[in-house]
Amino acid sequence: LSDFLLSKYKVSNKNYREYSKLTNKRALPVGPFMKNHPSLLSDDYSANATWQQAKDYCQWLGKESGKKIDLPTEAQWEYAARSRGQYLPFATNNGELLPGENFPNQDELDSYTDGIGLPFYPLGKFPPNPLGLYDMGLSGSEWTNDWYAADYYSHSPVNDPQGPAQGTKKVLRGNVGGDRQYALTMFRQSDLPVPKISKDDDYEKYGVGPQYVFRCVVNK
């Protein structure tokens, strides 16, 4: 991979609210789930966004700073999560997932999420991975720039793979609860760029769930 710098933290609610004010964008819709669990809207939790909203934020940051900033490719994300491509099952300080040490235990998750116990918590609460990146693969699924195809890496370029040229779903990486496999550094997921939260698919009513989060990359 060509040189890149991945953000130390995911984009926070505070970051995104400031961006919305500076760009005169509407605030993100807040659905019933988030209203019932207002801790998730606190300044130091990850911002929840559609794929395009996440990409727009990163590219705006690039325009303002004069740098090439975007969503990371899936390959960049995994390389960083695995601390330069090492075999590390989890992107924690030691490659293991240890509740109460480098990931919240159940009591902590309850306190962070108004009693619901889902795996979302404030940014930077636990040790980073060896590259200094916090919460990689944890506390939500992170958008990447790539379209998803199950067989993409069987024929992808060796250098700087960018994902398929087109598709219907975008690649996500990270844990949203349930089986720990979702937090594995090599586990692939995908979803529609505007995720369907409910059967009537009303984004203005439901927004997006707390699992759709992101961080940005600076490309050299």
Where are these regions (language model features)?
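A short glycine-rich, aromatic-capped structural motif
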Residues: L1-G31, T50, L138
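Conserved aromatic-histidine-acidic binding/catalytic patches
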Residues: D3-F4, K8, S42-S46, E204
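Residues within well-ordered beta-strands of beta-sheet-rich folds
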Residues: L5-S7, W60, T144, R215-V217
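Feature responds to low-complexity, polar/acidic, surface-exposed segments characteristic
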Residues: L28-S42
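Functional-site microenvironments in short loops/helix caps that host divalent-cation chemistry
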Residues: L40-Y45, W51-V194, P210
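Short, P/G- and charge-enriched loop/turn segments at secondary-structure junctions
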Residues: P130, V194-K205
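Short, structured beta-strand segments at or near domain termini in extracellular proteins/domains
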Residues: K205-K220
